[in-house]
Amino acid sequence: MASSSRSEKRCHYEVLGISKESSPDEIRSSYRRLALQRHPDKLMKAAGLSEAEATAQFQELVHAYEVLSDPKERAWYDSHRSQILFADHSSAGGSKSGGSVPDLFAFFSPTVYSGYSDTGKGFYKVYYDVFNSVYLNEIKFARTLGLRMDSVREAPIMGNLESPYAQVTAFYNYWLGFCTVMDFCWVDEYDVMGGPNRKSRRMMEEENKKSRKKAKREYNDTVRGLAEFVKKRDKRVIDMLVKKNAEMEKKKEEERERKKKMEKERLERAMNYEEPEWAKAHEGEDEGAGLSELEEEDDDAKRKNEQLYCIVCSKKFKSEKQWKNHEQSKKHKEKVAELRESFTDYEEENEEEEIDGPLDSPESVEELHEKLQEELNIDNEERDVKKEVVGEADETDDEYFVAEEDMQGSSESEDEDDEMTLLKKMVSGQKNKQKNVVSKEEDEDETEVEIEGDTAEFSEFDNQKSTGRNKEAKEERNKQNAGNDMADDTSKVQIPGEGGNPDENMNATESASGALADSQKDEANSMEYDNRKSTGRRRRSKKGKDKNNQGELNEKSSEADDTQYVNRDMESQDYKKAPRSKKSTRGMKTKGTTKKNSSNECDRCGEEFESRTKLHKHLADSGHATVKSR
């Protein structure tokens, strides 16, 4: 019986006439070719076989193609091919290794059943007996080992063609997820108790565990593979798949019909639609709308092409999100703060230039020149008044003043020359500043060159002016003190004149005091103007840089023109020599020390004064002037 069963079994590759390395396309083409040759009708006519034999050969061909066309079944068949070919289906109730495990490989073939009945060799009878034997073996092993009865779940019944589909689903779900409770101790390779030492026994135990695990995994895979094999050929499952496919096709057809109907209705509504009058747009508006859309598209394209760029940090950004994150960064905020501070400093400097603006214009230079000339005229008038007052008081002392004027004439002329030189430099410097400002506005990007000569002249001029102001302030205090003394003694003392008229002497005294007060006011205004002017020069001296060599040539030519201009003005004016210069005080004192009588003591009354000015005022008021012998 066993030999006959083995002779009936053939390898699937042999049935299809292909090799084990054949591709799915080769398997398909071979099956189609053999299906035409081994059709039952052709076999009965050509070979003269019976209908049963012809049908059996054709079913063998179909079964081989079904197994090898499925990648999973083909892989499982390749790994268990020898066991399937040499297994005996009659040992299903028996066992291997002491009857513990039933032999299931013999049932991976359609030859074990005939028809789908639940009796005899029917499909449901044969496979029910196989799965029932597996379940009973699990119960027996659990009882032998003393395991709990709930460790083995109850298996659903396979049923027949009349069973509900829920029972079919439950049956296959149970066996597709099967897991045995057997430990497969009979597959041990080594006898652990016969080990010579502890280490060897431990190694034997490890090898036996691996063998048991492998046998258990193979048994579970065999049972699950058999369940999948049976499900694929179960007529109930096949009929349910056909039914489900028919329902799916029906639903798809209904969905297509519904969509067609909806599309048809939509087209009908669109054809019957009439636009109301208020919704009709004029052609011009449509064109305008089209142009606006094109402009919007162009703007969008420009925005895409535009790159986000941070001017402060000199960085480019690909997205607006990166740009916003950069604006919130600490480095960006610090650089923005620095830039804002630099802008603020620049604005403050511009405001300072605007405050000093009138000094930089040509009109301001002319006004400055006129004002300086007026100051010179006022100084000349003041000196004339002083000369008249002193001349009237010291008429008897002409020889004394003539000798003193001869000794001081040279120093006074030198002081006047120094003062005119400073005046020329000041006027020239003002015009040079105006041209520097204009050239700076026109050529902002050219190289800045510092004019050391002008800076040196301005610094020298400032030093001389500051020294002169200190001396003028000291003389002004002396004049104020002398003026107060003169005001107190005016009503008591008469200045002797040529005619000896007291009224004329009083008028001369009053005119002298008025001229002295006016000169003091003018000197105060002049000092305030000089202070403001020197402050503006110091503020602009930091920025007094020329732009190019042409600016230097223009400065030199303008300086020469200004010098000629000042000389012409000086020649047109009738300057009178002052009897005593403000800046000649040092020279006068130096020359005075060479005289025999260097003390400030009155020869007549013997009173000593702090300065020669007070001594002269005392001589003028008291008439104690005497003629000195040569």
Swiss-Prot record:
Q: Which PROSITE patterns match?
A: DNAJ_1, DNAJ_2, ZINC_FINGER_C2H2_1, ZINC_FINGER_C2H2_2
One Pfam family, short name: zf-C2H2_jaz
What residues does the J domain cover?
Answer: 11-81
Q: Which residues form the C2H2-type zinc fingers? A: 308-332, 600-624
The Acidic residues compositionally biased stretches are 284-299, 344-357, 391-420, 441-460
The answer to whether UniProt assigns keyword Metal-binding to this entry is yes
Compartments it resides in = Nucleus
Q: Where is this region: Disordered?
A: 197-218, 247-302, 319-604
What are the Basic residues biased-composition ranges?
534-545, 578-594
CDD domains tied to this protein: DnaJ (cd06257)
Which keywords has UniProt assigned to this entry? Metal-binding, Nucleus, Repeat, Zinc, Zinc-finger
Molecular function terms from GO: nucleic acid binding; zinc ion binding
* InterPro entries named among the record's database cross-references: DnaJ_domain (IPR001623), DnaJ_domain_CS (IPR018253), J_dom_sf (IPR036869), JJJ1_plant (IPR044648), Matrin/U1-like-C_Znf_C2H2 (IPR003604), Znf_C2H2_jaz (IPR022755), Znf_C2H2_sf (IPR036236), Znf_C2H2_type (IPR013087)
Q: Where is the composition biased (Basic and acidic residues)?
A: 247-283, 319-328, 469-479, 519-533, 546-559, 568-577
Reply yes or no: does the keyword Membrane apply: no
Q: How does it assemble?
A: Interacts with REIL1 and REIL2.
Protein name in the entry: DNAJ protein JJJ1 homolog
Annotated organism of origin: Arabidopsis thaliana (Mouse-ear cress)
Primary gene name: JJJ1
